[in-house]
UniProtKB/Swiss-Prot annotation:
Family label: Belongs to the NDK family.
Protein name (Swiss-Prot/TrEMBL): Nucleoside diphosphate kinase
Family annotation (SUPFAM superfamilies): Nucleoside diphosphate kinase, NDK (SSF54919)
The UniProt record lists the keyword Oxidoreductase: no
HAMAP family reported for this sequence: NDP_kinase
Native organism taxonomy: Bacteria, Pseudomonadati, Pseudomonadota, Gammaproteobacteria, Legionellales
Organism name: Coxiella burnetii (strain CbuK_Q154) (Coxiella burnetii (strain Q154))
This protein's UniProt keywords: ATP-binding, Cytoplasm, Kinase, Magnesium, Metal-binding, Nucleotide metabolism, Nucleotide-binding, Phosphoprotein, Transferase
GO cellular component, one term: cytoplasm
Amino acid sequence: MAIERTLSIIKPDAVAKNVIGQIYSRFEKAGLKIISAKMCHLSKPQAEKFYAVHKDRPFYPDLVKFMTQGPVMIQVLEGENAIVKNREIMGATNPKEALPGTIRADFADSIDANAVHGSDGPETAKEEIAFFFKPDEIF
């Protein structure tokens, strides 16, 4: 099995609920190491650039607005099959469809305020990690 890295963002809704520690615990219980982390408040240009892949989608303006409404916690996770493992513990994008015990089932309010973001593949993970972290910030 391959050791991978993936980007995870705890979104403003989950940060506001004060569940960062509970989410970190789930990463660790799944065998994922947090090898870098930072809290920040995304600017509108940062959010627009990060989510540029969705620029032509109808939800894009609301996504940018949501992601800039409060602080986020951004982390790099590392472990065996980290990308798939993180997506499994996050749960379905729509929390109503997320399996019980997943982060979104337990902490998300809606498909828009869905608590967490995770990279969807190896190339995306590399790009997303590089967007937020310099190589010397990852341990």
